[in-house]
Amino acid sequence: MTFFSALGDMAHLAAIFLLLHRMKKSKTCSGLSLKSHLLFLLVYVTRYLNLFWRYKSLYYFLMRIVFIASESYICYLMLMTLRPTYDKRLDTFRTEYILGGCAVLALIYPTSYTISNILWTFSIWLESVAILPQLFMLQRSGETESLTAHYLFAMCLYRGLYIPHWIYRIAVHKKVIGVAILAGIIQTVLYGDFAVVYRRTVLQGKKFRLPA
């Protein structure tokens, strides 16, 4: 863990709890992609399957528990409590293509051919594109609430803070995990366009709206 990865984790937590606050306060999940959140839940479950038998540190243990529990709760709210407010007609991204592609990549190029490492590689690829259904939904609706935009920007910040973390690991430890670097670049690019629009709208007091 580095200073930048810790900051990234804090931004990630802020994004999750900002979203939960928005959902609980407004009692709606309108504008949110259930498909994206189910993909993120799958990311955490497949990545942290070794949670109870490969103990690394108390920090990692607690963070993994929080990520799984909070994402599970978000999915529960969207599937049960707030289901009447879910915009299913806009959440139409074909996630089977994402899942199939990530599974193939995990089998072709895992860090090693063990079940845990294949699942870890799958989770890395999946996290890089799990936001696509949300971005696609946003593209279809054309706009979103400010709190949802804040959540997505916090996710952008989380990803952005991991860039100096990668640079540090390469420069100091000479350790490069090609899959993680490539997937991280893909994820950064996907969030990048959103961050530009966010800066031009929400940070200037305007309603978030995608350009026509």
Swiss-Prot record:
Entry annotated with the keyword Membrane: yes
Major localisation: endoplasmic reticulum
Gene Ontology biological-process entries: intracellular protein transport; protein retention in ER lumen; retrograde vesicle-mediated transport, Golgi to endoplasmic reticulum
GO molecular function term, any single one: HDEL sequence binding
Record topological domains on the Cytoplasmic side: 22-35, 81-96, 138-149, 200-212
Function summary: Required for the retention of luminal endoplasmic reticulum proteins. Determines the specificity of the luminal ER protein retention system. Also required for normal vesicular traffic through the Golgi.
UniProt protein name: ER lumen protein-retaining receptor
Organism listed in the record: Schizosaccharomyces pombe (strain 972 / ATCC 24843) (Fission yeast)
